[in-house]
From Swiss-Prot:
Main location: membrane
Xref: Pfam families: BPD_transp_2
Family the UniProt entry places it in: Belongs to the binding-protein-dependent transport system permease family. LivHM subfamily.
A biological-process GO annotation: transmembrane transport
Transmembrane segments: 14-34, 49-69, 70-90, 100-120, 150-170, 201-221, 224-244, 250-270, 283-303
Record's keyword terms, sorted: Amino-acid transport, Cell membrane, Membrane, Transmembrane, Transmembrane helix, Transport
Membrane topology: Multi-pass membrane protein
GO molecular function ontology, one term from the record: transmembrane transporter activity
Keyword Membrane applies: yes
InterPro entries assigned: ABC_transp_permease (IPR001851), BCAA_transport_permease (IPR052157)
Protein name: Probable branched-chain amino acid transport permease protein LivH
Gene (name only): livH
Free-text function comment from the UniProt entry: Part of the binding-protein-dependent transport system for branched-chain amino acids. Probably responsible for the translocation of the substrates across the membrane.
Top-rank taxon: Archaea
Length: 315
């Protein structure tokens, strides 16, 4: 009886963690998808954006005693600034119609710069507060509600708020209409007098802002080190690719598929074959991503479901 209760409790915690992780992946994958649609840049620095947010949240906590949840608006702004700086750095390459490979290498360089800056900053912060800040978690600062972690409710609320805000922006404002037009056909949008440059700038600012917020929430579920961004970028890309890099909704679909699959499959493999399998969680994401590329190269949102249904009905 006790073993059964412990098993049920363990599965509840894993499912709870899977939903939290998926919520954060949605925020990060959405930013990656936005910048890819508008500028055709596969941003390998997206994970490091989040870790910048994590360390800013840590700074506000250690120096000013501000709860990480209350620092989310600040992280939104800081992330937006990082996204803006990245776009300004990449803009000359984009203007010259640089290849995807060159843009990818440029974002990798930016990621390495951010990694170095974050590592150096963690050492400076350690000297200021008098204890090592190279790695940290916020789990002990979280609250609980109805037996669930507070981060579950906060991350879910942030995702819902984001989706409502994006819907209102894209479908209820003139700028949103211009943004959608720029995403679907930049050349035609420019011909029609739409300021494509402004929409590109906005997408990078929003991408950084979302990553900053995700970074503030990430320490509530896992330990953060300066290189954490380079670990989670695998799952971020997997989420965007599985959902479909050509549609914003793909980030939502892919985020939950990758987040839940990675968490649950890793848990059950570890339960069956030992805890050594816990370190291979990212391999699950890669396998799902590769399988998706083989079956549906443009992701789930890129599948012509009506055509597929007709083919299945005639066979």
């Amino acid at each position: 009886m006790v073993k059964l209760l412990l098993k049920d409790l363990g599965e509840k915690m894993i499912l709870e963690g899977a939903i939290i992780y998926s919520n954060l992946l949605v925020l990060l994958a959405l930013g990656l998808t936005l910048t890819y649609i508008t500028t055709n840049v596969p941003n390998f620095a997206q994970g490091s954006y989040a870790i910048v947010g994590s360390y800013v949240a840590l700074t506000l906590l250690k120096l000013f005693g501000i709860c990480p949840y209350l620092s989310l608006p600040v992280l939104f702004v800081v992330g937006a600034i990082v996204g803006l700086i990245t776009y300004l750095a990449l803009k000359p390459l984009i203007k010259r119609n640089a290849s995807v490979e060159i843009l990818m290498i440029a974002t990798l360089a930016i990621d390495l710069i951010l990694l170095g800056v974050i590592g150096a900053y963690s050492e400076i912060l350690s000297q200021i507060v008098g204890s090592t800040q190279a790695k940290f978690v916020f789990a002990n600062l979280d609250f609980s509600l109805f037996g669930f972690k507070g981060i579950l409710f906060v991350s879910t609320f942030v995702v819902i708020l984001l989706l409502i805000g994006l819907y209102l922006l894209l479908y209820k404002t003139k700028f949103g209409i211009a943004l959608r037009a720029s995403m679907e056909n930049p050349s035609l949008a420019q011909t029609m007098g739409i300021d494509v440059e402004k929409t590109r700038l906005f997408s990078w600012i929003l991408s950084g802002a979302l990553a900053g917020v995700a970074g503030g929430l990430l320490p509530f579920m896992q330990e953060i080190v300066p290189a954490t961004g380079d670990l989670i970028i695998i799952s971020i890309f997997a989420a965007s690719i599985v959902g479909g890099l050509r549609h914003i909704s793909g980030a939502l679909i892919g985020g939950y598929i990758i987040g839940i699959s990675e968490s649950l499959i890793t848990y059950y493999l570890a339960s069956a074959f030992g805890t050594g399998f816990l370190v291979y969680g990212k391999v699950i994401s890669l396998i799902i991503m590769i399988a998706t590329l083989l079956i549906a190269p443009y992701g789930i949102t890129g599948v012509d479901w009506k055509k597929l249904k007709r083919l299945l009905s005639t066979s």
